[in-house]
């Protein structure tokens, strides 16, 4: 059975971020994606200038009411949320999650708690971080913070892998069943590897891959692709280990392709065959 995912996050017309990054790779793995855009911008914000608008929160609810009106909401297997244009949008998304789960009690909510990194040029609206801590976290079935977001969610510093596993379990105690720490950064085992953790109440998996050096300008949308692909693999019945290994390899293939083409925007179309069947393999370790 094809899985249907309502993906509520940002959209850029040029390039790849949010839905514009994740939607195609998710489809390439065999999922139906229903993109619902929280913002429509000309390009991602790390260029330093952009045009476009943030969608009114009511717009998100209206679109989903339209899907409910044609009696298709019960076919939705998961809601994925990413970059929010405002905290109020977040409240509407939680209303949508409740509506989807009422129509399909098996549906999952995957929250990618994008909180912004001003030094990276990723800007989020006031109140969004607080929304994720108070409301997004307890409502989610799966949550995917990076290290900075993990520290904000658990409200204390995280300095190494062991502390990251414990912090993830603190989050699990508040609602989600699965936590993906999608970039361990300085808390990882090695400074020259890209490392992730996938944690449940009784399992923890660690994986690492080589860093791909883009110099000063790291491509945007890597986390969006990572979250989207992990959700697809889990919905398709992959184990935690299988999902983590495939996603790590697929994202690495995109990064390597992007670097080889000397591009700044993720080359998801050029890498499409290796997203579905990665040529590299990275082994996850059970902690």
Swiss-Prot record:
InterPro entries in UniProt: PM/HMP-P_kinase-1 (IPR013749), PyrdxlKinase (IPR004625), Pyridoxal_kinase_PdxY (IPR023685), Ribokinase-like (IPR029056)
Pathway: Cofactor metabolism; pyridoxal 5'-phosphate salvage; pyridoxal 5'-phosphate from pyridoxal: step 1/1
Keywords tagged on the record: ATP-binding, Kinase, Magnesium, Nucleotide-binding, Transferase
GO molecular function, a single term: magnesium ion binding
Required co-factors: Mg(2+)
Annotated binding of ATP, by residue: 112, 144, 149, 182, 209-212
GO CC aspect terms: cytosol
Coiled-coil region(s): none
Reaction equation(s) it catalyzes: pyridoxal + ATP = pyridoxal 5'-phosphate + ADP + H(+)
Binding-site residues for substrate, renumbered to this chain: 10, 45-46, 224
Pfam families xref list: Phos_pyr_kin
GO biological process: pyridoxal 5'-phosphate salvage
EC numbers, comma separated: 2.7.1.35
Family, per entry: Belongs to the pyridoxine kinase family. PdxY subfamily.
Xref: NCBIfam families: PRK05756.1, pyridox_kin
Subunit relationships: Homodimer.
Role description: Pyridoxal kinase involved in the salvage pathway of pyridoxal 5'-phosphate (PLP). Catalyzes the phosphorylation of pyridoxal to PLP.
Protein name per Swiss-Prot or TrEMBL: Pyridoxal kinase PdxY
Organism of this sequence: Escherichia coli O157:H7
Species lineage: Bacteria, Pseudomonadati, Pseudomonadota, Gammaproteobacteria, Enterobacterales
Gene: pdxY
């Amino acid at each position: 059975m094809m899985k249907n995912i309502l993906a509520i996050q940002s959209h850029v017309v040029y390039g790849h971020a949010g839905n514009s990054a994740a939607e195609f790779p998710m489809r390439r793995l065999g999922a139906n994606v229903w993109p619902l855009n929280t913002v429509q911008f000309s390009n991602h914000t790390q260029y330093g200038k952009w045009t476009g608008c943030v969608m009114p929160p009511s717009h998100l609810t209206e679109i989903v009411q339209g899907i409910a009106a044609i009696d298709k909401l019960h076919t939705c297997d998961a809601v994925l949320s990413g970059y929010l244009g405002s905290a109020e949008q977040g409240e509407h998304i939680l209303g949508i999650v409740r509506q989807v789960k009422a129509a399909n009690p098996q549906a999952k909510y995957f929250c990618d708690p994008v909180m912004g990194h001003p030094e990276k040029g990723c800007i989020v609206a006031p109140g969004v971080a607080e929304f994720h801590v108070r409301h997004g976290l307890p409502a989610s079935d799966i949550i995917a913070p990076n290290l900075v977001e993990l520290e904000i969610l658990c409200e204390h510093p995280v300095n190494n892998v062991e502390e990251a596993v414990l912090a993830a379990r603190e989050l699990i105690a508040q609602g989600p069943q699965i936590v993906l720490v999608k970039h361990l950064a300085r808390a990882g085992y090695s400074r020259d590897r890209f490392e992730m953790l996938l944690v449940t109440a009784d399992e923890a998996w660690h994986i690492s891959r080589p860093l791909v050096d883009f110099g000063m300008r790291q491509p945007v949308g890597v986390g969006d692709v990572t979250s989207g692909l992990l959700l697809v693999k889990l919905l398709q019945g992959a184990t935690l280990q299988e999902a983590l290994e495939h996603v790590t390899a697929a994202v690495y293939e995109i990064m390597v392709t992007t670097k080889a083409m000397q591009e700044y925007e993720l080359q998801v179309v050029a890498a499409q065959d290796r997203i579905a069947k990665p040529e590299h393999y990275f082994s996850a370790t059970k902690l």
